[in-house]
A protein has these predicted regions:
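Short coil turns that delineate tetratricopeptide repeat
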Residues: 124, 157-158
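Alpha-helical linker/edge segments of TPR/alpha-solenoid repeat scaffolds
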Residues: 170-198, 210-211, 227
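Thiol-/selenol-based redox modules, centered on thioredoxin-like
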Residues: 65-142, 171
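Alpha-solenoid helical repeat scaffolds
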Residues: 131, 164-167
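Short, internal strand/loop/helix patches
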Residues: 29-58, 62-64
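Structural microenvironment flanking redox-active thiols in thiol-disulfide oxidoreductases
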Residues: 1-34, 45-46
């Protein structure tokens, strides 16, 4: 879908740049090749993007203008509605907002970008430092020591999927397996207190009325993912 929006809006000046936060260059390669991506598709194995822009989960989107200025705070923006019945994040409003901004029909954000941009707390920064230590140790053959730091990072930032889930493939844990679904279940049961869309693109019942989506349970999603090559 990112490729589709790139093809649609590139003639009007938009450049889509995707960054996969993954354990290796090979992990996202099949998805990039399957999409026949012609937009810049990068891989961040050190979690630098998540650190720089305080991203706690994916997908998180930033809009940057021609001057290199961030014109919209971190936002939740799914390009596909395949999992919308599970996440309850519909993409109708985010896509409409993006098109309107590119076509200069509306501002990028109606509020104060600086005031509404989510910044890390001291504990968040400590968690990312712990993750960085764990990552370095893992790259130097010290898996047991790395495990302690990854666990510590998750304890400091239980809300941060890029830390907790992001460490899973490095530690030999399936990032779409039981550990991830347990973590996602905790988030849902807690009322989804973090990783939420911005107010102007938040999902409403109207979105599902205008653009209905197929229902999918977590069990069905797991089965679908297991069946994919």
């Amino acid at each position: 879908m990112w490729q589709a929006i790139h093809e649609e809006l590139a003639p009007e000046g938009l450049v889509v740049l995707t960054v996969a936060i993954d354990a290796s260059l090979d992990e996202p390669r099949p998805f990039v090749e399957r999409a026949h991506a012609t937009h810049p598709s990068l891989v961040d194995i050190e979690h630098r993007v998540a650190d720089l822009y305080n991203m706690v989960n994916v997908p998180t989107v930033l809009w940057i203008d021609e001057e290199g200025q961030i014109v919209r705070p971190q936002d939740v923006h799914y390009m596909s509605n395949e999992m919308a019945s599970i996440t309850h994040f519909h993409n109708r409003k985010p896509l409409a907002a993006l098109r309107a901004w590119v076509r200069e029909e509306a501002p990028a954000y109606p509020g104060d970008v600086a005031a509404d941009t989510k910044v890390p707390t001291e504990t968040d920064q400590e968690a990312r430092a712990a993750f960085a230590v764990g990552w370095w140790l893992s790259q130097h053959g010290r898996a047991q020591a790395a495990e302690r730091w990854f666990v510590r990072a998750g304890e400091l930032a239980p809300h941060d999927f890029t830390i907790r889930r992001g460490s899973m493939p490095i530690r030999g844990i399936d990032p779409m397996g039981p550990a991830f679904f347990a973590m996602a279940g905790e988030w849902a049961q807690a009322g989804k207190p973090y990783y939420l869309p911005l107010p102007d693109t938040a999902t409403s019942p109207e979105d599902y009325e205008v653009e209905p989506i197929p229902e999918m349970s977590i069990e069905e999603l797991r089965a679908k993912l297991a069946a994919e090559p």
